[in-house]
Amino acid sequence: MNPIINFILLFSMMAGTILAMTSHHWVYAWLGLELNTLAIIPIISKTHHPRATEASTKYFLIQAISSALFLLSGITNAYLYGTWDINHLSNNFSKILLTIALATKLGLAPVHFWLPEVLQGVPILTALIIATWQKVAPMALLIMTWNLIPTPITLTMGLLSTIIGGLGGLNQTPLRKMMAYSSIAHLGWMVIIITIAPNLTLLNLTLYMIFTSSAMLTMHLTISKTLQNAMHISHHSPIITSLFLLSLLSLGGLPPMSGFSPKWLILQELTLHHLTPLALSMALMALLSLMFYLRATYISTMTLSPSIITLKTTWRLKSVSTTSSLSMLTPPSLLILPIMPLLIQ
């Protein structure tokens, strides 16, 4: 793709996200979401492969339907109450429509079916954008309207997302599909606490983006697409192998990694609000996600590829820019837990 066109698309994608995040008017927020969607469609389909075309078509249809539901929610509220302000949502039907529309854009269960298929059909860097940056605008709108969203719906979606994210990732060998189900499970943790403590949702989203970026940049650097390819990571560099292991363990939420802190705080908040059975269910469902993270770490770091040719370790990494971005993302994904008391005050 032409670098100028690529820059325009990335700039439009960022501008759409910022417009949606900062808007309190229904139409402006909808325009931001649409600009974001239309900018990433050419990025998804730029490889000229049938799977990329299929992924871009699925992504466009799902995002168009969710945008229509979002706009219908605003029009219904404006027709009944005469206001276009997002924070003045008084109709229950509009609240439910808004929740369903944003849940579809995020890929929350039970409207999650598009996310694994789309991520499997795109390159890893494009999958990274879909799994991280494309979650910012819908999640910002959910945080903006946290006091208007029906709590039973968010609790149900959150628990269902952690169950489906954990169960769906157990039998996956493609790494992109595994990261898609990981994204669904993490989104469940964010949504289940959003009407109780929205600041924890924002913290969880920030840490999730750091962890996922670190893991997927390692996959891109080592050209790993499946668990079988992950056996070759140790031939690139022992340091990269160690960073990949620690990033996956942080995604799984094992202490003392940074990924343990948001789960700990969310479980504590649920318990304080007398939702102990729900907190126990979330903790048990987190073990399902931890299972496939541990399987990926075992295969990538403790097993060798059954290759006839003796492979030498590639000590010289290919991309300086990718390595530098990975080196900036990895320390926060490992070392935030000791300073967590300062972050939550």
Curated annotation (Swiss-Prot):
Keywords from the named record: Electron transport, Membrane, Mitochondrion, Mitochondrion inner membrane, NAD, Respiratory chain, Translocase, Transmembrane, Transmembrane helix, Transport, Ubiquinone
Which reaction(s) does its UniProt entry say it catalyses?
a ubiquinone + NADH + 5 H(+)(in) = a ubiquinol + NAD(+) + 4 H(+)(out)
Instruction: Give the stretches traversing the membrane.
Output: 1-21, 25-45, 60-80, 113-133, 148-168, 191-211, 239-259, 274-294, 324-344
Biological process GO annotation list? Answer: mitochondrial electron transport, NADH to ubiquinone
Q: Which InterPro entries does UniProt cross-reference here? A: Complex_I_Subunit_2 (IPR050175), NADH_DH_su2_C (IPR010933), NADH_UbQ_OxRdtase_chain2 (IPR003917), ND/Mrp_TM (IPR001750)
This enzyme's EC code(s): 7.1.1.2
User: Does the keyword section mention Cytoplasm?
Assistant: no
Q: Which GO terms describe its cellular component?
A: mitochondrial inner membrane
This entry's Gene Ontology molecular function terms read: NADH dehydrogenase (ubiquinone) activity
**Pfam families under this entry?**
NADH_dehy_S2_C, Proton_antipo_M
Instruction: Determine if Iron-sulfur is one of this entry's keywords.
Output: no
| UniProt-annotated location(s) | Mitochondrion inner membrane
Topology in the lipid bilayer: Multi-pass membrane protein
Any idea what job this protein has? Core subunit of the mitochondrial membrane respiratory chain NADH dehydrogenase (Complex I) that is believed to belong to the minimal assembly required for catalysis. Complex I functions in the transfer of electrons from NADH to the respiratory chain. The immediate electron acceptor for the enzyme is believed to be ubiquinone.
**Family membership noted in the UniProt record:** Belongs to the complex I subunit 2 family.
Q: What is this protein called in UniProt?
A: NADH-ubiquinone oxidoreductase chain 2
Taxonomic lineage of the native organism: Eukaryota, Metazoa, Chordata, Craniata, Vertebrata
- Gene this chain is encoded by: MT-ND2
